[in-house]
Design a protein with these regions (language model features):
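Flexible loop residues that form catalytic
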Residues: 5-6, 76, 126, 161
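A generic structural signal for nonpolar/aromatic side chains embedded in well-ordered alpha-helices
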Residues: 16, 43, 68, 144-145, ...
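A general structural signal for short secondary-structure junctions and capping/turn motifs
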Residues: 14, 111-114, 147
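His/Asp/Glu-enriched, well-ordered alpha-helical/loop segment
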Residues: 41-130
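C-terminal cap of metal-dependent C-N hydrolases
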Residues: 117-164
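Active-site core of metal-dependent hydrolases
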Residues: 1-58
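Short secondary-structure transition/capping segments
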Residues: 36-38, 63-66, 135-136
């Protein structure tokens, strides 16, 4: 695992891909240290395995939902830096990188695959601002990811067991 890789050139990225190195993108740390914004979209297009990390030494957040949204925001900054040529991460992509991509490193399967132990949280979004129209499940998920606070988590499932 290599953290950040903000300034890896084409030769280094090719070596990272060939060696099967996992890049831990730590957007919060990169922003706090003013070290740059990783070209995550470019790395993904090159076939580099990217996951998300908090790098609490330089980052400021441990909750993965905050790491995910920070990574999406950082990718939007990268889009501006590249004159709009590099697409930013979507919420589903950020969620995948912050969950399944890292889980795979430890031998876990894809997402909510049959036979895989459940890892999930239950979110009460009742105190989130009302929308002017009914939200789809995806829109509620996206809103929850950005507005979530610890008190909104009403249940936690880990390895198929409810732990909260």
């Amino acid at each position: 695992v290599m953290a950040h890789c903000d300034h890896s050139d084409a030769r280094e990225c090719a070596a990272i891909r060939r060696a099967g190195v996992v890049v831990a993108h730590c957007a919060g740390s990169n922003i706090n240290l003013c070290s740059g914004v990783s070209p995550v979209r470019e790395m993904l297009q090159q076939g580099i395995w990217v996951t998300l990390g908090s790098d609490i030494a330089g980052g400021a957040q441990l909750p993965m939902y905050k790491v995910i949204t920070m990574s999406i925001r950082a990718s939007k900054i990268k889009r501006m830096e590249t004159d709009w040529s590099e697409d930013f991460l979507t919420v589903p992509e950020g969620y995948y990188l912050g969950t399944t991509a890292g889980h795979r490193y430890f031998g876990g399967g894809e997402g909510f695959a049959v036979g895989q132990p459940l890892h999930a949280i239950v979110v009460d979004d009742g105190d989130f601002p009302e929308s002017v129209r009914p939200l789809t499940v995806r829109e509620r998920f996206e809103r929850s990811l950005y507005m979530l606070h610890r008190h909104n988590i009403t249940a936690v499932w880990s390895h198929g067991r409810q732990v909260k």
